[in-house]
Amino acid sequence: PVVRGFEASRVLLMVDGVRMNNAIFRAGHLQNIITVDNMILDRVEIIYGPSSTLYGSDALGGVVNLFTKQPQLFKSNITSKKAAWNVDGNLVYRYGNGQNEQRQHIDINIANNKWAYLTSFTNSSFGDLRQGNKRSSTYPDFGKRFFYVARENNIDVVKDNSASVNIQKLSGYNQTDLLQKLMYQPNENTTHILNVQISNSSNINRYDRLTETSKGLPVYSEWYYGPQVRNMIGYKLTKSQLNGYFQKLTTNVNYQHLEESRMSRRFKSNDKEYRFEAVDMVGLNMDLLHQGKSSALNIGVESYYNNVGSTAYSNNIATNVRSSIATRYSDGPTNMANYALYAQHTQFLKGNWVLNTGLRLNSVQLNANFKDTALMHFPFTDANQDNTAITGNIGMAYNGAAGLRVSFGASSGFRAPNVDDLTKVFDTRTGYVVVPNKDLKPEYTYNTELNVSKTTSTYSIGASLFYTWFKNALVVDKFKWNNASSILYQGIMSDVYATQNKAKAIVYGFNVNGSANLTPNTILAATYTYTKGNYTNQKPIGLNTALPLDHIPPSYGRIGLKHELKKFSAEIFTVFNGWKRIEDYNLNGEDNEIYATKEGMPAWQIWNINTSYQPTKKLNLSFQIENIADLNYRYFASGISALGRNYVVQARYSF
C-alpha cells in the first residue's frame, strides 16, 4: 500500500498487533500483504503519518493495521454444570472469469463460555490475468503480450501470442492460507489468545521481467519468485480491572518465519540463478493503560529481533553443475534488533477539547557479515549500525456540537536502515546493479496535518491536509564500487548504483470525502486524494524544476451510489486515477518508467457494479461486474496491466 506518498518499508504493516515489517522489507514494491488472508479479515485500520508513538521505525507514511477475526465465546442461557458447546461457521466459494479466479474458504468456530477455537482455511487459484481490450488510439498496443518464452526440446523458443495479446501469459499463481486461534477466558477480566497463521504460495512469475526485450529478443526465459512463506505463532494476554494505577495490561509475544526466493535465467542461457532468503523474527510488546476521569496514559515496551539467512548458487540446466554467485544479502551471520520505550497521553480538556502527546525512544542495531567477498570484490567484510532516536507527537482535537470535529497536530518519524537497504546486491533492470553501502544513516520525517469533519444523521463531509519534511532520505543513485562506476554483473557490464542518504524532500497533499443519505436506503459516497512530492536539494540535469520523489501516486478517487433493502443490495461505483506524466517520474527510483508509455501513465476511469442477495438467513449470493467497459489500464509503477471486464460470483453459506 501507498500511504501519503510512502510505501513498502516506509509504511508499517501490522497483523493482529504483530509487526510484519522485517529486516529485508525492501524500499521498492512489496507483495507481502497478500500473505494475510482477506477471507478471514475482520477490519483494516489506517493511521496516517507517524502520529502515534505506539508504533516505531518504518511508520513514516503511516500504519496499516490488519485485524483477523477473533474466536467467539458461546454464552448459553441453559443452567448446567456442564458448559454448553456451539459450532458455527462459513463456507465460501468465489469465481471470477477475468483470470479464472477460484477461491474456496471455510471457517469454523467451536466454543463454550470459556473456550473458543477458530479455524480458517482458504485455497486460492489465479490463472493468467486478462487485461482490458479497450485502448486509447494514442497507445493502441500498450500492454499487449505479443510473445512468451517456452522450453521445447531443451531449447528456449519464442512463442507467438498475437492471437490472444490481452492474456498476460505466465501471470497466474496459487496460494493457501491457514489460521488457527484458541481463546481461553477464565473470567471477564482475563483473556488468553493463541494465534497461528500459515501462508504459502506457488511460484509467482515476475511478469514485468518476462516482457523485457533487448535487440528484439526476450531478456529472460525465466524470472520468478519461489513460494512466499509466512508462518506466525503469537500469544496475547489481556488483563483488565487491575489494582493500582494501571487498569489494563496487554502483552503480545510472537515468532515469525518468512521465506523468499528468486530464480532467473536469461534467454538461451543454460545458467539458472537461485537466491534464497529466510528471516526468523521474534517480537515482544507489553502495554499498560491508565484510564482516569479526564485523562488516559499508555506506556509500553517493544522489542523485535531478526535473524537473516541469504544463500545463492547458479545451476547449469544442461550439465547440472553448480557454481557460486553473489547472494542478495550478506551471506554471513546477519541480524537486526529493534528496542523501544513509549508513552502516549490523552488529556480531556474543557470545552470539548482533547490534547494528545507522546514520546518514543527507539534503538536499532544491525550487524551484517560478508563471508564470501571474492565474487563482488567487497572492500569490507562487515557492516554495523547502532542508531538511537526520539520521536514524538502533539495534537489537539475539538469535538464540537452537531458532529463538528477539528484536529491538528505535529509529529516526527524515524526509519533505521535495514538489511535490505544496507547489504543488498540486485538489478532492477538490465545494465543496472545496486551494491551495498555500509555508511547509511536513519531517515527522519517531520509532519503537520489538519483534519476537519462534519457528521449528521443525513450526511458527512471531511477534509485532511498534510505536509511532511523528509530528511536524510535514502535514495538510489550513482555510486562507485572499488573506484569503478560500472562492473560486470550476471555477465552484463552494468552501471553501479547504491542506496545513499543524499536527499531532502517534501511531501504534501490533501483528501476530501463525503457521503449523503439520499433516501433511508440510498447512500452516495465519494473520496478524492491528491499527493505531491519532490526533492528540495536535487534537480534533473538541465532543468530548473525540482526532482520528483518516487512512489508518489497520481491523484485518485472513488464515487459510489449504494441502495440497500432487507435482502438485496446494489452499488454502482467508479474508481479513477489521474495522469502520471513522465516528467513526474523519478528515473533512478522505483517508479518503473520503462513499463509506462513515453508520456507516462495515462489517466483512467473504470465503472463497477456490486450486488448481493440473501434469500435465507444462512445463504448470501453476490454478483459483481468489474471494469464494465473493459478498459485497458495500468496502475502507476506497475509492470502488469489490470483486469479487463471481470464477472465475479460468490456464494456464502453460514451454519
Regions found by a protein language model. Give the residues of each.
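Surface-exposed extracellular loop regions of Gram-negative outer-membrane beta-barrel proteins
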Residues: S202, H257-S261, S314-V321, Q365-M376, ...
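Signature of Gram-negative outer-membrane beta-barrel scaffolds
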Residues: L297-A401, D427, Y497, K539-N544
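Outer membrane beta-barrel strand-and-loop segments of large Gram-negative receptors
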Residues: E277, M281-D287, N338-A340, V435-K441, ...
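N-terminal periplasmic accessory domains that precede
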Residues: V2, L13-M14, L30-I34, I46, ...
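Transmembrane beta-barrel wall of Gram-negative outer-membrane proteins
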Residues: Q99-S125, R135-N203, V229-N231, F348-L349, ...
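Gram-negative outer-membrane beta-barrel transporters
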Residues: K350-G351, L355, S363-V364, Y467-W469, ...
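Flexible loop and strand-edge segments within Gram-negative outer membrane beta-barrel domains
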Residues: K169-Q175, Q185, N189-F246, H257-V279, ...
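Short acidic/polar hinge/loop motifs at secondary-structure boundaries
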Residues: M20-P50, L54
